[in-house]
Amino acid sequence: MSERRLLNAGGFAACAALLAYALYTQYYGGLEPCPLCIFQRIGIALLGVVFLAAALHHPRGRGRYLYALAIAIVALATLLVAARHVYVQSLPPGTLPSCGAPLSVLLKFTPLWEVVRKVLTGSGECAVVNWRFLGLSMPAWVLLWAFALGAAGVIANLRASSDDPQVMRRFADS
């Protein structure tokens, strides 16, 4: 198995583990996700799908650049949502609007772009920090993981592997 395929499969496994832990804390730990948490879960899930597609497809040549770009875009979007969440959690109490309607209600009665705008502005429920590990909240960990997975995915897919025909031609020409 090539190194790039293995790294993409590892990226998928890391995303799956992050989502599994998020679901564990929700259903067994009693932590209800706020709308920003749900957006971060969607981002990690999409990142996992891109990693899985890159591992299964494993394109040679220029095709790997498309996967590097897709990983970069999804990881950056997830990182930005997590950064917004960390910022919302750092604001002093009383500076955010009160908790609004649940995300399921917003999705049912509000246009999608308005839902995205409302979620990204944050609400009172997004400012609550009820979980920490090594002093960092869950959104801070998502921020770190999105950065690490995005960087690893981009580097792994930009770097030519030994099973790439272009690399083999370069070695044959020298």
Protein language model regions, located:
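Interfacial segments of alpha-helical transmembrane regions
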Residues: 2-13, 59-81, 151
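C-terminal TM-helix exit segments that contain a strictly Trp-centered aromatic cap at the helix terminus
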Residues: 17-26, 77-92
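Alpha-helical transmembrane segments of multipass membrane proteins
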Residues: 20-24, 52, 129, 154
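Membrane-interface helix caps and helix-loop-helix hairpins in membrane proteins
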Residues: 28-35, 87, 132
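Non-cytosolic membrane-interface motifs at loop->transmembrane helix junctions
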Residues: 31-41, 67, 97-100
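Structural signal for the C-terminal ends of transmembrane alpha-helices
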Residues: 52-60, 154-160
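Extracytosolic (periplasmic/ER-lumenal) interhelical loops and adjacent juxtamembrane/interface segments
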Residues: 90-137
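A hydrophobic membrane-anchoring alpha-helix module
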Residues: 121-174
